């Protein structure tokens, strides 16, 4: 059985591309270290990657992709990771909060009707990610199974833009 998707794998690739200069995230007006990169990793998949960047180093990142609608509203799945050197400092929590505010600011005016969800599916055994999701999305997650791996997971959901 495969493992639950690990956002840290994508973070390593993002970090390498940032250092090599093959990607150029744009600065966000809301936070001096917050940058965003919009890309299409595969046909039909739009991805927004937010990162706290200093010089050519990403300290933490959060990736948003469109997921299945929830309660008739758009839903974005979020995954996040922090560079090993910066873990335990609250950066992932700060980044998820800052990136959700930026996403809400840019997306809300474009929606046909108000409101969209952000969802994190977190492995039941991932204590660090559960803390971040509890602090940023919901204090009352729903027990579920990860669709890809079948492993026990928790679903954290937050409604934005209303």
Feature roles, as predicted:
Residues 74-76, 152:
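Residues on conserved beta-strands of the protein kinase catalytic domain
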Residues 79-91:
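A short, internal acetyl-CoA/4′-phosphopantetheine-binding micro-motif in the GNAT/acyltransferase core
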Residues 88-105, 131, 135:
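Conserved acetyl-CoA-binding loop-helix of GNAT-fold acetyltransferases
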Residues 105-121:
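Conserved GNAT acetyl-CoA-binding A-motif
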Residues 145-162:
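C-terminal "cap" of GNAT-fold acetyltransferases
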């Amino acid at each position: 059985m495969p493992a639950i998707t690990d956002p840290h794998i994508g973070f390593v690739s993002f970090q390498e591309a940032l250092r090599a200069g093959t990607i150029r995230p744009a600065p966000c007006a809301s936070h001096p270290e917050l940058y965003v990169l919009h890309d299409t990793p595969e046909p039909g998949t739009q991805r927004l990657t937010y990162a706290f960047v200093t010089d050519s180093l990403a300290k933490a990142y959060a990736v948003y992709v469109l997921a299945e609608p929830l309660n008739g509203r758009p839903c974005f799945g979020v995954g996040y990771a922090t560079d090993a050197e910066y873990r335990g400092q609250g950066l992932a929590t700060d980044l998820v909060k800052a990136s959700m505010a930026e996403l809400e600011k840019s997306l809300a005016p474009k929606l046909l009707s108000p409101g969209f969800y952000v969802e994190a599916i977190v492995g039941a055994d991932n204590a660090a990610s559960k803390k971040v999701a509890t602090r940023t999305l919901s204090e009352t997650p729903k027990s579920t199974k990860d669709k890809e791996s079948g492993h026990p997971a928790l679903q954290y959901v937050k409604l934005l833009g209303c």
